[in-house]
UniProtKB/Swiss-Prot annotation:
Main location: mitochondrion
Protein's membrane topology: Multi-pass membrane protein
Gene name linked to the record: MT-CYB
Any Pfam family matching the protein: Cytochrom_B_C
Organism, as annotated: Tamias quadrivittatus
Family note: Belongs to the cytochrome b family.
Keywords: Electron transport, Heme, Iron, Membrane, Metal-binding, Mitochondrion, Mitochondrion inner membrane, Respiratory chain, Transmembrane, Transmembrane helix, Transport, Ubiquinone
Residues reported in the UniProt entry to bind a ubiquinone: 201
Protein name as catalogued: Cytochrome b
Domain of life of the source: Eukaryota
Length: 379
């Protein structure tokens, strides 16, 4: 009798995805982040579900319901801080996962890559709306500032913003709909993740060398299941250290003050994982230009398959491209730092230079260096 795992219509799909999946024999720890993102998503959905049981999406009670969760609900503080810091872990894994894709040329699987970029947008939207829900000062003003950016769209901008707000300012209607969207989006993300994996399994995984690995494949289980479990243990360890020792390390103290439309905080800034994009937005004096730059800073990822000029897929054997890649990473760290600083000299000019460098490296310098490296191959 054949094993049920290979014949049962449903178990067969799981088997081909996680057990008998042929995987390259040389994929490094950088390939762990896909499974870690899956774990992050599961943690976020579960903790979010339990938080939703006690949260009320009303402007009068939202802030106090979060206080109630932390004070009165059994282990409510743990669930709340796991959810808040879980989002940070999610984005750390996301950035490393995308960085891995850029370094090793995984973007040449362009269906998988483009769905990944859509996933990135969806996760960013979910995180933004989640940040609004506790209804603290930074929640309210962050929502006001970011939704207001849509008013830069010519002709329909103002109408669009008021339509999203459900009134003439961020109020009860906005909070209620943000809660509804924040609840539904993770399930849409889960569906997109399945499509992401579907396209990935059509081609098989890339590997550090960027070469075709069909001649040397190993089964996913037990080799990569055990490797993933190690990654998961480390992820949960880091998350729990963060949650139990310094849960507010990555948060904003202003969010412990209830939302007050009459009092603007001195420095409005988003969570740390949006600061690089926020810095790019602020570095352009024109409102519409800033919004376009903000969207393009993420959307530009979709251009990587077109901008790939090298004869080699991976950067493993391309030292000049490697050097430029790490300069890009340093530039993103600089942008993240600038995004958290006030708008004054010298931060304005540093932000503008870092923003120009970001787009120049991706659109001009990396493709040019790739062409130069192709020439070097002939020497």
């Amino acid at each position: 009798m054949t094993n049920i795992r290979k014949t049962h219509p449903l178990i067969k799909i799981i088997n081909h995805s996680f057990i008998d999946l042929p995987a390259p024999s040389n994929i490094s720890a950088w390939w762990n982040f896909g499974s870690l993102l899956g774990i992050c998503l599961i943690i976020q959905i579960l903790t979010g579900l339990f938080l939703a049981m006690h949260y009320t999406s009303d402007t009068m009670t939202a802030f106090s319901s979060v206080t109630h969760i932390c004070r009165d609900v059994n282990y409510g503080w743990l669930i709340r801080y796991m959810h808040a810091n879980g989002a940070s872990m999610f984005f750390i894994c996301l950035f490393l996962h995308v960085g891995r894709g850029l370094y090793y040329g995984s973007y040449t699987y362009f269906e998988t890559w483009n769905i990944g970029v859509i996933l990135l947008f969806a996760v960013m939207a979910t995180a933004f709306m989640g940040y609004v829900l506790p209804w603290g000062q930074m929640s309210f003003w962050g929502a006001t500032v970011i939704t207001n950016l849509l008013s830069a769209i010519p002709y329909i901008g103002t109408t669009l913003v008021e339509w999203i707000w459900g009134g003439f300012s961020v109020d009860k209607a906005t909070l209620t709909r943000f809660f509804a969207f924040h609840f539904i989006l993770p399930f849409i993300i889960t569906a997109l993740v399945m499509v992401h994996l579907l396209f990935l399994h059509e081609t098989g995984s890339n590997n550090p060398s960027g070469l075709i690995s069909d001649s040397d494949k190993i089964p996913f289980h037990p080799y990569y299941t055990i490797k993933d479990i190690l990654g998961i243990i480390l992820l949960i360890l880091v998350l729990m250290i963060l949650v139990l020792f310094s849960p507010d390390l990555l948060g904003d103290p202003d969010n412990y003050t209830p939302a007050n439309p009459l009092n603007t905080p001195p420095h409005i800034k988003p969570e740390w994982y949006f600061l690089f994009a926020y810095a790019i937005l602020r570095s352009i004096p024109n409102k519409l230009g800033g919004v376009l730059a903000l969207v393009l800073s993420i959307l530009i990822l979709m251009l990587f398959p077109i901008l790939h000029m090298s004869k080699q897929r991976s950067m493993m054997f391309r030292p000049l491209s490697q050097c430029m890649f790490w300069i890009l990473v340093a530039d993103l760290f600089t942008l993240t730092w600038i995004g958290g600083q006030p708008v004054e000299y010298p931060f304005i000019i540093i932000g503008q230079l870092a923003s120009i460098l970001y787009f120049m490296i991706i659109l001009l310098i990396l493709p040019t260096i790739s062409l130069f490296e192709n020439k070097l191959l002939k020497w």
